[in-house]
């Protein structure tokens, strides 16, 4: 298989494509997140008036989606390629299609469809008008026009593209099982598959997420993260009229932490339906407070 069609080659091509469009190519955020949207380069930078273009790979964790490595396309740990463009360019769809062509998808031979699917993140207090992109009947990407993040209206509106890298690679390579994906494009004994890299981790983390994660410790961690977030927001609050907030990002880290701990508790099955909504609201309140703090920083547009 050509290097370009390998899993890592796909990532490199997307990075090169979006760098050519003026995006800063960032690295994954160094915290456990449920989706690429949680990266502050998207959530926080979508707020405020300042222009922003960025692209990055983000490992994402959804503990409840683990299947002990036995499901061919369902994972508790997977990769997204995220693009955020603010203000939203008028040719976002054309840029997206050009990126598919760059990774080797022949747009004339394949059935490319956009299916309306508005996006919402209850924990981030965010929503947007969106479409899923289907290639020959398989969803491979989503693009969204952010209307609101952390409870604040997005002005200007930002355009966001999310590529599901495993699904996209399965489509490009024509494989039915994610663990059969060619990871590095090498031949013979040097060939590495997705399963070689991640199958054992999927098996082990599924056991952790469903069976072994210490729930008493997780409840404490949630409370600690919630308290730390509020403490940092208070400590960084402006001390004079017109001053800037000084700790929006450390506080947001704790919001991310609380969200992931909640997802682990949810996977362990120790949160009831009514409690679940309460926890979502608690994380949302943290996200809103962090968004308000961000808007009082230089990057958030404060004078």
UniProtKB/Swiss-Prot annotation:
Superkingdom of this protein's organism: Bacteria
Entry EC no(s): 6.1.1.14
Gene3D superfamilies given in the database record: Bira Bifunctional Protein, Domain 2 (3.30.930.10), Class II aaRS and biotin synthetases, domain 2 (1.20.58.180)
GO BP, sorted A to Z: glycyl-tRNA aminoacylation
MF terms (GO), sorted A to Z: ATP binding; glycine-tRNA ligase activity
InterPro entries for the chain: aa-tRNA-synth_II/BPL/LPL (IPR045864), Gly-tRNA-synth_heterodimer (IPR006194), Gly-tRNA_ligase_asu (IPR002310)
Presence of keyword Cell wall biogenesis/degradation: no
Predominant localisation class: cytoplasm
GO CC annotations on file: cytosol
Keyword line: Aminoacyl-tRNA synthetase, ATP-binding, Cytoplasm, Ligase, Nucleotide-binding, Protein biosynthesis
Pfam annotation, one family: tRNA-synt_2e
CDD domains to which the protein is assigned, alphabetical: GlyRS_alpha_core
Reactions listed under catalytic activity: tRNA(Gly) + glycine + ATP = glycyl-tRNA(Gly) + AMP + diphosphate
Quaternary organization: Tetramer of two alpha and two beta subunits.
Family statement: Belongs to the class-II aminoacyl-tRNA synthetase family.
Protein name: Glycine--tRNA ligase alpha subunit
Gene field: glyQ
């Amino acid at each position: 298989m050509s290097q370009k069609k390998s899993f890592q080659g796909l990532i490199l091509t997307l990075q090169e494509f979006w760098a050519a469009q003026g995006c800063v190519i960032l690295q994954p955020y160094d915290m456990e997140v449920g989706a690429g949207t949680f990266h502050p380069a998207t959530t926080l930078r979508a707020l405020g008036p300042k222009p922003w273009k960025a692209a990055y790979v983000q490992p994402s964790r959804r503990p409840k989606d683990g299947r002990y490595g036995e499901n061919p396309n369902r994972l508790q740990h997977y990769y997204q390629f995220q693009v955020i463009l603010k203000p939203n360019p008028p040719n976002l769809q054309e840029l997206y299609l050009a990126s598919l062509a760059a990774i080797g998808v022949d747009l004339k031979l394949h059935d490319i469809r956009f299916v309306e699917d508005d996006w919402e993140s209850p924990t981030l207090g965010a929503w947007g008008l969106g479409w899923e992109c289907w290639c020959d009947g398989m969803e491979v990407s989503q693009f969204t026009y952010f209307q609101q993040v952390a409870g604040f209206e997005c002005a200007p509106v930002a355009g966001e593209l999310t590529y599901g890298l495993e699904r996209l690679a399965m489509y490009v390579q024509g494989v039915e099982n994610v663990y059969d994906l060619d990871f590095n494009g090498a031949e013979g004994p040097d060939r590495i598959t997705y399963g070689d890299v991640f199958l054992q981790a999927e098996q082990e983390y599924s056991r952790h997420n469903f069976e072994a994660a210490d729930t008493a410790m997780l409840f404490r961690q949630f409370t600690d993260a919630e308290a730390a977030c509020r403490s940092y927001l208070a400590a960084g609050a402006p001390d004079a009229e017109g001053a800037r907030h000084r700790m929006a990002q450390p506080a947001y880290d704790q919001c991310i932490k609380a969200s992931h701990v909640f997802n682990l508790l949810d996977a362990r099955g120790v949160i009831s339906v009514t409690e679940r909504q309460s926890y979502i609201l608690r994380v949302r309140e943290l996200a809103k407070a962090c968004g308000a703090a961000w808007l009082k920083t230089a990057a958030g547009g404060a004078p």
